[in-house]
Amino acid sequence: HREQILNMNGLRPLIKIYRFLTVFGIDPLRALNSIKGIPYYIKNFILLSRQQKSATVKFPFANLYPCLDDRFSNSGIANGHYFHQDLLVARKIFQNNPKLHVDVGSRVDGFVAHLAVFREVEVFDIRSLDININNITFTQMDLMMTGDSELFEYCDSISSLHAVEHFGMGRYGDPVNYDGYLLGLNNLYKILKINGKFYFSVPIGPQRIEFDAHRVFSMSYLLELFKDKYYIDSFSYIDDNGDLHENIQIKEKN
């Protein structure tokens, strides 16, 4: 969200510096807003303390818990890659109503949670999930390594949203493998039944690795990967400002 603010204000060169600082837990924009919030904090504390004296029901002041930058925030972040993709793909799965949907590596606290509201979903992820959630069946596995024949043509619907770009990068404890994304995509294809639906997202642009965050894929390369395996029903993307462009004609610019 804060990177999008820098984008929209024409300060994109600062994003690299901002990312570097946040790696070490330093958030300059949040720090600036927190400093701006100090006068409001003091003023409101004094006002509330005065009003407490005449209140019928008392709430005693306990530990101080300053939230100095919240007054400068919106009511949630209603844009960005994850926000739009999670809602878009959840809507499509609701409309298609598959018999068995499997998700691989997407956010449990976003997209998977959306699905769990209205249907059961099986989740495969190299990361652990330590709690039980209604409608979610979790299996910890490395999708680069799976050779389990029981999973071949296992489901009629599968998703992997902003996950494959990480395969083999080592970021989440997976073994480093330069071709990890290919192994993952091949296994996803094997898990899906013939004529099944595959919902997929990765970063797109000039092809590169931004280590150790992710890979970025060119459209031409993705189309080459998929041409003999899938028919593309629809293509949507989220731009650098976090806005969704839905059902767009594909162009191989990169």
Sequence positions of predicted segments:
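N-terminal accessory regions of S-adenosyl-L-methionine
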Residues: 5-100, 111, 211-229, 233-254
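Surface-exposed cleft-lining segments at the edges of enzyme active sites
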Residues: 72-78, 166-180, 208-209
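A short acidic, Gly/Pro-enriched loop at the edge of an enzyme's catalytic core
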Residues: 147-158
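A conserved beta-strand element that flanks and buttresses the S-adenosyl-L-methionine
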Residues: 159-164
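A short glycine-rich, Lys/Arg-flanked "PGG" loop and its adjoining helix->strand segment in the class I
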Residues: 176-194
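Conserved beta-strand signature within the Rossmann-like core of class I S-adenosyl-L-methionine
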Residues: 195-203
